[in-house]
């Protein structure tokens, strides 16, 4: 992660009752430099989790930040609270999105794929891909399904590979999830706030990770992204979780994934037609277009 190393700060019980204010302030400043985009309340919780006691209030943390020139406009913006919907249990809905692509030092563009669980905010995937095609995305989502099980629904935007700019037909991604019994949901066009938690994650990912690293190549990106994912899930407190971490609220799905797709079963009162590869059946007015 960004900033200075804290290798000398052991996770043994620490109390500062007899320390002078400058000594307390020095430790707080060291933590702030390690986590420069983390606000006072969350940093206060992180230090508490690291077994520091008798800490000053988060308000005093902010005063210390100001005295030491450690308050940024980005951090203030990130502290703004928003009203959001929330699902009732883990894996009821996953949210997926590509963070805006950027050029790595080797000249190749990186397309970060991020997927979070709506209920717990657990980041399930933070992968540096080289494109946004279904063929590149699918193996990573299959790995998630094998590791965490199947969600009940999957919220994504209308861009590749999730959706289409047209209102007709289904994408390969939608058909695949349909066969697995997972409902695909799409955000409203030009309304990214529908995926507020995923957009919020992308913002945190940018401020707390990408801003502080020059990424050489895909291998380097994978290492940096995984380090941030561990921090985000297991160390970083979340205001919406009462300052708990996502991993404390997440449990895998009981719906197991199988790469073998079951055959569809129909009742006797339904007539089954074969269609062409484009989804059109010539002897019927019904037209289902697969793209």
Where do the model's predicted regions map?
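Short, polar/charged, Gly/Pro-enriched helix-capping and turn/loop motifs at alpha-helix termini
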Residues: 42, 75, 151, 155, ...
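RNase H-like DDE/DDD metal-dependent nuclease/strand-transfer catalytic core used by mobile genetic elements
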Residues: 88-95, 100-112, 118-220, 224-226, ...
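Residue-level "edge-of-site" marker
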Residues: 60, 78, 158, 189-191, ...
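C-terminal, beta-rich DNA-binding module of retroviral/retroelements integrases
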Residues: 233-291
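Basic, flexible linker segments flanking DNA-binding modules
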Residues: 2-96, 101, 171, 247-255
